[in-house]
Swiss-Prot record:
The gene is sey1. This is Protein sey1. The chain crosses the membrane at residues 742-762, 766-786. It is found in: Endoplasmic reticulum membrane. Residues 1-741, 787-859 are cytoplasmic. It is a multi-pass membrane protein.
Length: 859
């Protein structure tokens, strides 16, 4: 004989279906729960079925053929008792899936074979009987009560004690859940039914017994008037004797098996009148609403409460199960969620570490897809559990997912923000440079507006592509407003920068124009002749009006620059305040340019050169601008004195910037104006202080307009006089040199004495050709006006040769004793005219001595 006890270890480690041929022992005889129940359900493909499964338990006395009944009804292989012995076969509680492949039966029927009652092995120990009944009632939809016909009407034989226990634990189980009335089906299968007693009579007897049992149990407050039909439905079926009518038994069990299908309650039947359904046994209200994937965990929790004699609270157990399963499902769906989202999180965090925010392609689609899949997967698996727990855990899942997705969303918007700002700045700069290279006018405001619109459109495109519908954090209006605000700030900064560049270009233009115009005024300074220094038309400029002309040129140039600046700034969409600041800066910068140009022209060397040129113009040229050729009869001293005094009047004139019309400095402070109220410290930091305009500078306008100090004026006067004296001495020499003339008779004497040589030259072709070449060279030299320089160079070379000869002679004499004695006896004095010595290295460009110009050479 084989008993179920032999298979008690099955299911502990095996993972294939053959190991579960006899089912799985859910609870062994030692009241231990088998943790591999979930594995069995998974192998039988019950786990994914959700609520689409049914659980049946069978009760009855020991050795009454419960396992045999189940094997015939459901095709299971529960071990049965040998007919040769009568002892306990089923130990604990076993479970097996329905093997009957009849299409009329419900799918996924799980059958529990409960250890029989009233067995001699346990004797009077009814603890397991009560615990197993409680477990079966807490988990099963249908309770099959297996009794023999001859036991109907008996107390012990008809399992009345067991049924009383069932009624009591039913109230215990569902008392705490008063919102729902849980129902179960008690299906009485009457074995060895002979048919002599009508089944209706047996039903009546059993129902009377049920009513008495219900009335006999202790009921909690509020349920004193309840009856058994409030909690239980009843069905009855009679089976013939298996031993005496085996074929009939098989036939009837097959018919009975067809009733294990989904059914509907017939409202026309009244159980109190003995009207019972003979249709499908699985009504929706019987189902315990425990999803198949959580059944093993639920059953384990139920048994743990039962075996530890704790108050069994099914709603609490359902919540605990829901908590456990929802946590498991949440972790599972988050694994799939992580597979999609983690790569994007890694990319984003790496880009953030590198300081190079990157717009992640496909992020929005991945976020929406992963969130939807996670929520749907969770909903599909967890929605079958306790609604409150499910909703709470779903909210937790959405919160976890949304927290991470929000971070990605914010990071994406941040990347779009930073890259957009950078691209906007680069695009505006590139467009401006392109317009400058083409040489065509460009509208800066239009460029900024177009690029800003593109930047906003791109930002919105990225944001819309990343939005996850149905989430509160997907509203990017605030981020868009911040982005537009920064775009406006960057636009303002670019406009300020462009206006600075415009101002720089205008300043360079002013510098160029002033450099030319003011330079011309200085070049024409004090020209006293109608030659190259005089204007082509009209009268020559008056020296007294020099600063007036400079100021007028300056003001006109700056006004023209202001018009250019204002016209160009209008295309920048600049405000009036920005234009005012730009014009104010332009005037200050322009004054700095003018003052720098004046200082450049008025440095000591340049000014001394200007004074000498002014003096030479007045001294060397007459009033008609014709060069003077000095003769001994000319009033060289008078002309020299007038020219020198006239030039000396320029020194005090140039020392201070004063207008001839007002005899006062120009109104620089009024012309520049007050500092605009909108000017910032950045607008003033690169501006040089101006005396008389900036109070904190400590300089007056008079000091600002002082070009040459008094000490410099005196030094300049002395050096100019020395230079003028040199010019005067040179003029005096040229006049004296012209007094030496060759007598006319000398030319006749030269012709008479050299006649033979003349004839010899004319008759000799070689001499004649040489003479011809010399004549042509002399003519060309005359036409190029080079005779003067040649004569001067020759004279200087000869003088230099004489000087060098004297030097060598002196060195020779100094090297001998006789020479040293002769030198010692000689009187001091120089050689040459007036004691002057001329060296080639000391000649000026006219071939004259540069001794008189030694101060000018300090430029």
């Amino acid at each position: 004989m084989a008993t179920n006890g032999h298979f008690a270890s099955i299911g502990n480690s095996a993972s294939d279906t053959t190991a579960y041929e006899h089912g799985v022992q859910v609870i062994d005889e030692n009241k231990e729960f088998n943790p591999n129940l979930s594995q069995y359900l998974s192998l039988e493909n019950v786990t994914p079925s959700g609520f689409n499964y049914h659980l049946i338990s069978v009760f009855g006395s020991q050795s009454t053929g419960k396992s045999t009944l189940l094997n015939h009804l459901f095709g299971t292989h529960f071990s049965v008792m040998s007919e040769l012995e009568r002892r306990q076969t089923t130990k604990g509680i076993w479970m097996s899936k329905n093997k009957n492949e009849s299409s009329s039966m419900a799918s996924n029927i799980l059958v529990m074979d409960v250890e029989g009652t009233d067995g001699r092995e346990r004797g009077e120990d009814q603890d397991f009987e009560r615990k197993s009944a409680l477990f079966a009632l807490a988990t099963s939809e249908v309770l099959i009560v297996n009794i023999w016909e001859h036991q109907v009407g008996l107390y012990q034989g008809a399992n009345m004690g067991l049924l009383k226990t069932v009624f009591e634990v039913n109230l215990q189980l569902f008392l705490k859940d008063k919102n729902t009335t849980h129902r179960s089906l008690l299906f009485f299968v009457i074995r060895d039914y002979s048919g002599m007693t009508p089944l209706q009579n047996l039903q009546k007897t059993l129902m009377e017994d049920m009513a008495r049992l219900w009335d006999s149990i202790s009921k909690p407050g509020g349920l004193e008037n309840s009856n058994v039909h409030d909690y239980f439905d009843f069905q009855f079926y009679g089976l013939p004797h298996k031993g005496y009518q085996p074929e009939k038994f098989v036939e009837e069990t097959q018919k009975l098996s067809l009733r294990f299908c989904d059914g509907q309650r017939d409202p026309n039947l009244d159980a109190r009148k003995g009207e019972f359904s003979d249709g499908g046994v699985f009504l929706p209200e019987y189902h315990r609403r425990i999803p198949a994937d959580g059944f093993s965990r639920y059953a384990e929790g139920i048994w743990d409460q039962i075996v530890n004699n704790k108050d069994l609270d099914l709603p609490t157990q359902q919540e605990l199960l829901a908590q456990f399963r929802c946590d498991e499902i949440l972790r599972e769906v988050m694994v799939a969620f992580d597979e999609t989202i983690v790569p994007f999180e890694d990319k984003q965090s790496q880009a953030a570490r590198l300081g190079e925010p990157e717009i992640l392609g496909g992020l929005g689609a991945a976020m929406r897809s992963s969130r939807t899949k996670a929520v749907k997967a969770f909903e599909s698996e967890a929605s079958r559990y306790h609604k409150g727990v499910y909703q709470r855990k779903r909210a937790e899942l959405e919160s976890k997912a949304d927290t991470r997705l929000k971070t990605l969303f914010q990071g994406q918007l941040n990347a779009a923000h930073k890259s957009g700002i950078s691209e906007f700045s680069e695009a505006v700069t590139a467009a401006v440079k392109s317009g400058q290279k083409k040489g065509t006018g460009y509208d800066f405001a239009e460029i900024v507006n177009e690029e800003a619109k593109k930047a906003v459109d791109k930002f919105e495109e990225v944001a819309r592509a990343t939005v996850v519908d149905g989430t509160s954090w997907s509203d990017y209006k605030q981020e868009l407003a911040l982005y537009e605000k920064e775009l406006a700030e960057v636009s303002a900064r670019l406009r300020r920068d462009e206006m600075r560049r415009l101002a720089s270009r205008v300043e360079r233009w002013v510098q160029s124009r002033l450099g030319e115009s003011v330079g011309l005024e200085f070049n024409a300074l004090g020209s006293g002749r109608a030659g190259g220094g005089a204007p082509e038309k009209g009268d020559q400029p008056t020296e007294k009006k020099f600063w007036d002309r400079v100021w007028n040129v300056f003001v006109e140039t700056v006004l023209d620059a202001e018009r250019r600046f204002t016209d160009r700034a209008s295309s920048f969409d600049a405000s009036l305040e920005e234009v005012d600041v730009g014009l104010w800066r332009l005037r200050r910068k322009s004054w700095g340019v003018l003052r720098a140009k004046i200082d450049e022209e008025m440095i000591e060397g340049n000014l001394l050169l200007k004074l000498r040129e002014n003096f030479e113009d007045k001294f060397r040229y007459d009033d008609a601008g014709v060069p003077r050729i000095w003769r001994p009869t000319d009033d060289i001293e008078g002309i020299y004195t007038r020219a020198r005094e006239s030039t000396l009047t320029l020194i005090p004139l140039l020392s201070k910037f004063r207008l001839d019309e007002t005899s006062a400095p120009p109104p620089l402070d009024r012309w520049i104006g007050h500092t605009p109220s909108s000017a910032t410290s950045a607008d003033e930091e690169d501006l040089a202080p101006i005396g008389g305009v900036d109070e904190e500078e400590g300089k007056s306008l008079e000091e600002e307009m002082t070009i040459v100090s008094d000490a410099k004026r005196q030094e300049l006067t002395v050096r100019f006089k020395k230079a003028a004296d040199g010019v005067y001495v040179e003029a005096k020499r040229s006049a004296i040199g012209g007094m030496t003339q060759v007598p006319l008779y000398f030319y006749g004497l030269l012709l008479a004495l050299g006649w033979n040589e003349i004839i010899a030259v004319l008759r000799n072709p070689a001499y004649f050709f040489l003479l011809f070449v010399c004549a042509v060279g002399a003519y060309i030299t005359y036409q190029l006006n080079l005779w003067g320089p040649i004569i001067k160079m020759t004279e200087a070379a000869s003088n230099q040769a004489v000087t060098e000869g004297k030097k060598r002679l002196r060195e020779f004499l100094e090297s001998s004793d006789t020479g040293r004695q002769a030198i010692a006896m000689s009187t001091p004095g120089g050689s040459g005219r007036g004691g002057e010595e001329h060296e080639m290295s000391r000649l000026n460009q006219q071939g004259k001595s540069a001794a008189a110009d030694e101060d000018v050479d300090d430029l």
